[in-house]
Amino acid sequence: MTDSEAERAERAAFILSLRRRGIRDLAVLRALELVPRGLFVDPTLRRHAYEDVALPIACGQTMSQPSLVALMTEALALNAEHTVLEIGTGSGYQAAVLSHLAAQVVTMDRYRALVGEAQTRFQVLGLRNVAAFVGDGTQGLPGRAPYDRIMITAATGEVPRALVDQLKPGGVLIAPIGAPREVQKLRRFIKDGGNLEASDLMDVRFVPLVAGVAALL
């Protein structure tokens, strides 16, 4: 079996494992199948790329386990006309998955190094509907607003008001709510007027959402 055949087999088994974990949206499963997670992990960890585990990345951050990526993506209820804002680019894996389901993905991170690496991966994969920026995630990107969907991939005590304002009426926002280093609630919000109506999805642990742009990395 060649390396490419081995990887295809590994990815097929990976998708089956996600189905067993309750992911039913075929479009989401197809998006995860199309994105080679191995490209987004450290070369020393590639043997774990298709395991359902969170993995460390640069700048002291982590990339979520695939089942959580799938669940959060499924909860957004995307269609091919949506514009999505992702807060917390990280490795770029989540944005790459979103790119196969939405018209436009805007992703941002406070770490220049992470954004640069993610942009390179997007280019390698030929993803032309993803735009990555360095910036303060608590403030979003008002110049590109409004957004149909917003995904926050870092824990926050409450959804920053700037992000609420950038979400379209009836739009969906997914975020882990709670204190750092504690169990948080992954919540799905729907914008009703100027407010958000929330429903809990599951318990999670995410790194904290930090204001500002990193000075050194």
UniProtKB/Swiss-Prot annotation:
Pfam families: PCMT
Record protein name field: Protein-L-isoaspartate O-methyltransferase
Gene: pcm
SUPFAM superfamilies in UniProt: S-adenosyl-L-methionine-dependent methyltransferases (SSF53335)
Domain of life: Bacteria
Biological role: Catalyzes the methyl esterification of L-isoaspartyl residues in peptides and proteins that result from spontaneous decomposition of normal L-aspartyl and L-asparaginyl residues. It plays a role in the repair and/or degradation of damaged proteins.
Catalytic activity: [protein]-L-isoaspartate + S-adenosyl-L-methionine = [protein]-L-isoaspartate alpha-methyl ester + S-adenosyl-L-homocysteine
Subcellular location: Cytoplasm
Catalytic machinery residues: S64
